[in-house]
Design a protein with these regions (language model features):
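Binding-site signature for planar aromatic cofactors or substrates
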Residues: 1-152
Length: 152
């Protein structure tokens, strides 16, 4: 799945989504995930593996409040990934949310929040000639990290 990384700190990497989406269902069904950052033009990538868990309600609320109002309203109007009979139906639902929250702050919907991926393995890959790539792996070990190389 493609996601937008919205934060990272010593606790992990955070992205936000509709928890009724297929993507969220997949993560909730199997929280062992991988994030992949690929930069073709730089001939490098980073892969992060670890368990994903929901962010706190306070974190979800704070990030939702930072979004543009139109995006907040869209989160309320959308049944993400479900069949839609017409664009007009969605636009009508969106307009209903505009009216519902007119003059008020838009709260975070109960079905919308974020996941934090806690890294257990981080692999740095660099393209090399003749597929003799360089792969460096960091593995969480207690409170620290161990480092090693992998064959290409």
């Amino acid at each position: 799945r493609m996601v937008l990384l919205k934060g990272h700190d010593e606790r992990g990497f955070v992205f936000y989504t509709n928890f009724e989406s297929r993507k969220a269902g997949d993560v909730l069904g199997n929280p062992n995930v991988a994030l992949l950052f690929h930069w073709k033009s730089l001939r490098r990538q980073v892969r992060i593996e670890g368990p994903a868990s929901r962010v706190t309600n306070a974190e979800g609320d704070a990030y939702f409040a930072s979004r543009m109002r139109e995006s907040q309203l869209g989160a309320w109007a959308s049944d993400q990934s479900r069949p839609l009979d017409s664009r007009e139906t969605f636009e009508t639902r969106y307009q209903a949310m505009v009216e519902r929250f007119e003059g008020k702050d838009v709260p975070r919907p109960p079905h919308w929040s974020g996941f934090r991926v806690v890294p257990e393995r981080i692999e740095f890959w660099q393209d090399r000639a003749h597929r003799l790539h360089e792969r460096r792996l960091f593995t969480r070990s207690g409170e620290g990290w161990s480092e090693g190389l992998l064959y290409p």
